[in-house]
Amino acid sequence: MKARRQRKIIEIIHRQVIATQAELAQVLRKAGFAVTQATVSRDVKELGLLKASDGQTVRYLPPGEQPVAAAEERMVRLFRDYVWEVNANESLVIVKTLPGAAQGVASALDYARWPEILGTVAGDDTIFVAVKSQRDVGGIRERLAGLLEG
């Protein structure tokens, strides 16, 4: 049910301008989904949706369609709100988050499209960041740790 609902959310935001979670919940209900505001909020977070403005309207966009600057801004916000430690060994950068936040933070890292990062694997509160080369590990660790300091 959750996967079907989230696919429907992506379909909806591609078809029409949705500016608020309340609006999205209303459209989902009309489509036959019994949702609460909390459910929609979790879905928005898990899908990595971000609000974007074209100067006249504000709407939700899926991560792949977000401008890189917006993806970077989202990542900074998520790091400040949910990450409490960044560490590394010789091959991986490890990011520790509050419980339940790793998936969203990892998604933000993926969509920021840093060229040194191959990808991420997230559990509940831990993210493994795969870096292109060993020589990049220290730099990525420092850059991510810097996001915590603001």
Swiss-Prot record:
One of its GO terms (cellular component) is cytoplasm. It is found in: Cytoplasm. SUPFAM superfamilies: C-terminal domain of arginine repressor, Winged helix' DNA-binding domain. Pfam families: Arg_repressor (PF01316), Arg_repressor_C (PF02863). Keywords: Amino-acid biosynthesis, Arginine biosynthesis, Cytoplasm, DNA-binding, Repressor, Transcription, Transcription regulation. GO terms for biological process: L-arginine biosynthetic process; protein complex oligomerization; regulation of arginine biosynthetic process. Signal peptide: none annotated. It comes from the Bacteria. GO terms for molecular function: arginine binding; DNA binding; DNA-binding transcription factor activity. This is Arginine repressor. The gene is argR.
